[in-house]
């Protein structure tokens, strides 16, 4: 089982001081976080794309490239790339460049985008939300197949037998589909034989098990070898030396971030009782000491079918030293527990 970190590189006001960290400082911090994740043996680090004041990473590939030359093994992925409002040629070129710098460690996670600020910014109509994604994913996958491409569509000028460079080290450059749980997205990923990332950030993770099953059925129906496909979970969480400390440190920034989204999207306020329910064993928050978080990840593997887990930390803005400690604990204490038990369980399932 692969284990890693994801972040949106937020720059919201510090919950205690009210200070807002600059985009530049937060970007430098996240590079340090990626380097540490590599040092403690985590498998993957993801950076999400946003185009608003309270998020610093509008170009995940650039952030990941800054870390690529300072890391040796960790895979580097977007989390996600808002493909619907991007030019697939530039996306491919950016991540092929990252793949070269990292010597074959780049990945793209393509999503439609739960944040929509990039659509008006780049001149796209939200009425074309689904059509844009389908067309641009089609082009991105064509770019994987061959050096020279001929392609035409509705929302981008046609390409006529044109070479697209640089070419990636990996053949093909990995493309994942990111989904919040939409059945259509899950089926699309399965039919295309692409790995899937599920944003499991609310409710019970157990409710995603039918979607994982649907994904594998779609893949098999299309003739793909389901045993070679991966389903990942992107889930909020935080690790500290003891569970109550983890909860008390993680809640304030999480509440602030969730209430900001609540005001924008018409949700109800986020309370401590909601937070505590979500960090229960059946909930979608992975908050606690290393052993508690390990138990929940193991449960997710055994009962939902997740084979890559991304701990999304921080939610909102937390002190950099707290995030670094959480990454250290994840790599040195939680990850070994998960890997040992999952390896034992998978061996018993095969026998």
Give each language-model segment a name:
Residues 15-16, 84-194, 206-209, 213, ...:
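Internal, glycine-rich beta/alpha segment that forms the wall or movable "lid"
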Residues 25-36, 94, 180-187, 292-299:
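Short, acidic/polar
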Residues 1-3, 42-44, 71-76, 101-107, ...:
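Short, well-ordered coil/turn segments that N-cap beta-strands
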Residues 3, 37, 41, 49, ...:
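Conserved, mostly hydrophobic/aromatic
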Residues 1-75, 171-173, 348-351:
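N-terminal beta1-alpha1-beta2 module of alpha/beta enzyme domains
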Residues 44-67, 82, 200-203, 312-323:
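Glycine-rich, proline-tolerant flexible connector loops at the mouths of alpha/beta enzymes
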Residues 5-9, 128-164, 205-307, 339-351:
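An alpha-helical appendage that flanks or caps ligand/catalytic pockets
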Residues 38-39, 64-72, 95, 99-106, ...:
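Acidic (Asp/Glu)-rich catalytic clusters
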């Amino acid at each position: 089982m692969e284990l890693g970190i994801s972040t949106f590189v937020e720059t919201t006001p510090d919950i205690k001081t009210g200070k807002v960290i600059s985009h530049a400082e937060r970007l430098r911090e996240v590079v340090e976080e990626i380097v540490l994740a590599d040092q403690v043996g985590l498998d993957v680090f993801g950076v999400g794309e946003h185009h608003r004041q309270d998020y610093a990473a509008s170009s995940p590939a650039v952030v990941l490239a800054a870390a690529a030359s300072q890391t040796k093994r960790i895979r580097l992925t977007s989390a996600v790339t808002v493909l619907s409002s991007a030019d697939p040629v530039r996306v491919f070129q950016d991540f092929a460049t990252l793949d070269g710098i990292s010597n074959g460690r780049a990945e793209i996670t393509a999503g439609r985008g739960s944040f929509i600020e990039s659509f008006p910014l780049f001149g796209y109509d939200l009425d074309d939300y689904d059509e844009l994604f389908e067309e641009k994913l089609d082009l991105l996958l064509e770019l994987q197949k061959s050096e020279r491409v001929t392609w035409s569509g509705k929302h981008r000028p046609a390409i006529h037998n044109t070479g697209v460079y640089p070419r990636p080290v990996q053949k093909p450059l990995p493309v994942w589909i990111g989904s919040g749980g939409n059945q259509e997205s899950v089926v699309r990923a399965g039919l295309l034989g692409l790995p899937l990332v599920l944003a499991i950030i609310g409710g019970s993770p157990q409710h995603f098990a039918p979607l994982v099953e649907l994904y594998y059925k779609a893949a098999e129906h299309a003739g793909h070898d389901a045993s070679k496909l991966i389903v990942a979970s992107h889930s909020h969480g935080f690790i500290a030396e003891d569970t109550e400390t983890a909860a008390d440190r993680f809640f304030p920034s999480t509440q602030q971030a969730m209430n900001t989204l609540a005001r924008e999207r018409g949700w109800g306020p986020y309370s401590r009782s909601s937070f505590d329910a979500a960090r229960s064993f059946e909930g979608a928050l992975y908050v606690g000491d290393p052993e508690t978080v390990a138990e929940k990840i193991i449960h997710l593997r055994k009962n939902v079918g997740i084979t890559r887990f991304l701990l999304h930390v921080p939610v909102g803005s937390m002190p950099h030293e707290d995030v670094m400690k959480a990454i250290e604990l994840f790599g040195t204490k939680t990850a070994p527990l998960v890997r040992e038990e999952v390896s034992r369980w998978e061996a018993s399932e095969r026998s």
